[in-house]
């Protein structure tokens, strides 16, 4: 025969497992993802990786080991069903300068 404590804990654990998750304030909106490396990014500026980049506050910088395009200036993931990208949508495979510059980018048509 079960003790009262065992019955109590069994009931509480079953009740807890059936409750809805508590909202945390974070939204889990799906991102538009046409890339193998992460979400499609909407960036203010893109240019050839072989050209020096003028980053405000840093001056001209050169990106090493990058092919294709580099993207910089307020890059953010696109959200499905959300706002459209008014600048350039890109798919990138890495970052440099502590995330200020996305490297190895290709244009994405939406």
Swiss-Prot record:
UniProt cross-references to CDD domains, sorted A to Z: hydrophobin_I
Molecular function as annotated in GO: structural constituent of cell wall
Uses in industry and biotechnology: With its ability to stabilize oil droplets, exhibits a better emulsifying activity than the typical food emulsifiers Tween 20 and sodium caseinate and can be used for the food industry.
Subcellular location, record wording: Secreted; Secreted, Cell wall
Annotated InterPro entries: Hydrophobin (IPR001338)
Pfam family, any one: Hydrophobin
Intrachain S-S bonds: 35-91, 42-85, 43-75, 92-105
GO CC annotation: extracellular region; fungal-type cell wall
Keywords: Cell wall, Disulfide bond, Secreted, Signal
Residues making up the signal peptide according to the UniProt record: 1-27
Family according to the record: Belongs to the fungal hydrophobin family.
Function: Aerial growth, conidiation, and dispersal of filamentous fungi in the environment rely upon a capability of their secreting small amphipathic proteins called hydrophobins (HPBs) with low sequence identity. Class I can self-assemble into an outermost layer of rodlet bundles on aerial cell surfaces, conferring cellular hydrophobicity that supports fungal growth, development and dispersal; whereas Class II form highly ordered films at water-air interfaces through intermolecular interactions but contribute nothing to the rodlet structure.
Record's subunit section: Self-assembles to form functional amyloid fibrils called rodlets. Self-assembly into fibrillar rodlets occurs spontaneously at hydrophobic:hydrophilic interfaces and the rodlets further associate laterally to form amphipathic monolayers.
The name this protein goes by in its record: Class I hydrophobin Po.HYD
Source species taxonomy: Eukaryota, Fungi, Dikarya, Basidiomycota, Agaricomycotina
């Amino acid at each position: 025969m079960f003790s009262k404590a065992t019955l109590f804990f069994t009931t509480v654990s079953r009740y807890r497992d059936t409750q809805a998750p508590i909202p945390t304030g974070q939204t889990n909106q799906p991102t538009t993802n046409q890339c193998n490396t992460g979400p499609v990014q909407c960036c203010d500026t893109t240019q050839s990786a072989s050209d020096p980049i003028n980053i405000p506050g840093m001056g001209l910088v050169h990106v090493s080991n990058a092919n294709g395009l580099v993207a910089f200036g307020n890059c953010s993931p696109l959200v499905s069903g959300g706002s459209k990208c008014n600048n350039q949508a890109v798919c990138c495979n890495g970052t440099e300068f502590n995330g200020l510059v996305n490297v190895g980018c290709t244009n994405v048509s939406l």
